[in-house]
Amino acid sequence: KRIIDECNRQGKPVIIATHMLDSMIVSSLPTKAEISDIANSVLDGASCLMLSAETAAGKYPVESVRTMSKIAKEVEDDIENKELEDTNHLTFTDCIVNAISKIDGLIDIDSIVVITSGGYTARMLASKKLRPKIVAITTKKKILRQMHILWGVVPIIIEGSIDNITNKEKEKAILAALEQGIITKTNQIILTGSVFHFKSKRTNMLEMHKVNEFLDFVKKNE
């Protein structure tokens, strides 16, 4: 639990693996202890649960995956947002992420769209276990692959540069999420990223939009 807490605090993905459904190597049903272990792993803040022998050599690989997925989904709604504990050494990104967490508790947000070149902001958002889906937009395939493991994150790759985020880049990100069916035009979203190009890639933008209103605004001001 301490390792998971520390990883969450630093925005590091946590994979919990090995013998999570060991009985399902030979049985089609899990034990109560295994169900409890999976549920507690999710509640503790794991990013990913991994099966090994259950799917590599077990008699019930599909049932094992289905069982683990079902248990995880059942308990995900009970996860509480994780607040920042150390407020003495906050970065720009920490402050933005904490603000997003508080906004989500005040107003109904459907999705958080984060434009990220290195994935750091997406990792920090994922570590807070927020209710809205996090749509992470990047231009790099390597970062896209890395973000697939993050809790609650749906990564999307787009073409072009995101070093300096203008309204056109924001529009491109939102349209990519729309095309994938992750958000709709009636959704309320939070949009975050880095407006200016810094060597340290500081996250310094936080906007709230209704998708259709933002797209109409950009179109009228082209």
What are these language model-derived features?
Residues 121-123, 129-167:
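Nucleotide-binding motor/catalytic cores of P-loop/tubulin-like NTPases across gene-expression machines
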Residues 180-192, 196, 203-216:
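C-terminal binding/interaction regions
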